[in-house]
């Protein structure tokens, strides 16, 4: 009898331990558990995806899906691929409607919308202009002559492309598109949407510096994004960031000339071209960071605002509650300062905010 009682007590203790262990496991799994980082290459740059989830993450399967998405987008919008959708459209010299994929149409439609909002300072028809200045898949060499720039300007202008019922039409047979200023942002949005529809909530997606995120990071806090400090001397190299953004779910993109430039006969030129004058911009704006709901919108606005003075950009954004911007400026005295438009939470800025 004593043996049976002892056995019963031991059995009950083990059951209690199992139940307690199960409860502890359940509590643990209710919190963000598994954390993964996926890296790869796309659109001539790199991408990083971070996921925090309380469910099993099939990393290889997710990476395969992400790579498939990005390969498809690259095949649609890469001007470096002669067989891409955009390259074929650029060779099309007809005024008849041209059938395009849904995603390609969406990006072009958004580009034209942004062109109208910025009075043409964002222009996706600058393919030949960029090539003339040494950018793009078939760059020319040397500083171009003004007559050649003026000749190309007769072929550019967003008014030369029409979106209608899923097709594109050219008003000028020689018009050519370049979507590099908006395609990376669109790629971020598409990957982000794929992860959300796959059931993930704590996500961080970055392609070439353009980011979109939601939920919480690996430390169970809001995601943070560093604001890159443009390098112009040895002191700048010691201070890689000029501030940190700590916003809840949003999309962020930055445009600046320090990342992409070309050396033409000893002259260093940034890749941001004024689409109206045809010349690289000369400005006291060092960089523009834009925050909005979609990364495509942030990407496009950042490029557009980089072509303008701060006063012009702030005037256009005034009253636009869906877009916020941070300008890093160089003052007349050579000192840097920050100015902003919209609702922005910037932490630890190293320059004055004016």
Residue ranges and their predicted role:
Residues 2-13, 27-354:
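Mature catalytic core of soluble alpha/beta enzymes
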């Amino acid at each position: 009898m004593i043996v049976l009682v002892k056995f019963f007590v031991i059995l009950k203790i083990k059951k209690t331990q199992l139940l307690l262990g199960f409860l502890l496991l359940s509590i643990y799994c209710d919190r963000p558990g598994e954390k993964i980082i996926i890296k790869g290459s796309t659109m001539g740059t790199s991408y990083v995806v971070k996921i925090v989830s309380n469910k099993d993450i099939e990393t290889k399967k997710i990476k395969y899906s992400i790579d498939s998405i990005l390969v498809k987008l690259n095949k649609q919008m890469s001007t470096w691929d002669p067989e891409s959708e955009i390259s074929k459209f650029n060779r099309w010299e007809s005024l008849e409607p041209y059938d395009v994929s849904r995603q390609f149409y969406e990006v072009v439609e958004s580009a034209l919308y942004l062109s109208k909002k910025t009075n043409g300072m964002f222009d996706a028809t600058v393919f030949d202009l960029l090539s003339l200045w040494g950018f793009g898949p078939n760059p020319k060499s040397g500083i171009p002559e003004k007559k050649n720039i003026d000749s190309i300007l007769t072929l550019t202008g967003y008014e030369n492309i029409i979106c209608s019922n899923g097709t594109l039409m050219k008003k000028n047979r020689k018009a050519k598109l370049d979507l590099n200023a908006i395609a990376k942002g669109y790629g971020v949005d598409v990957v982000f949407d794929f992860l959300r529809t796959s059931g993930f909530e704590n996500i961080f997606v970055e392609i070439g510096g353009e980011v979109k995120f939601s939920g919480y990071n690996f430390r169970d806090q809001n995601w943070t994004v560093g604001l890159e400090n443009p390098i112009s001397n040895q002191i700048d190299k010691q201070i890689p960031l000029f501030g940190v953004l700590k916003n809840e779910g949003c999309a962020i993109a930055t445009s600046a000339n320090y990342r992409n430039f070309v050396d033409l006969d000893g002259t260093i030129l940034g890749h941001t071209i004024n689409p109206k004058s045809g010349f690289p911009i000369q400005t006291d704006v060092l960089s523009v960071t834009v925050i909005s709901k979609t990364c495509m919108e942030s990407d496009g606005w950042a490029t557009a605002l980089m072509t303008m003075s701060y006063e012009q950009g702030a005037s256009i954004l005034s009253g636009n509650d869906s877009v916020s911007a941070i300008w890093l400026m160089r003052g007349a005295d050579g000192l840097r300062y920050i100015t902003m438009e919209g609702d922005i939470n910037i932490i630890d800025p190293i320059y004055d905010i004016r």
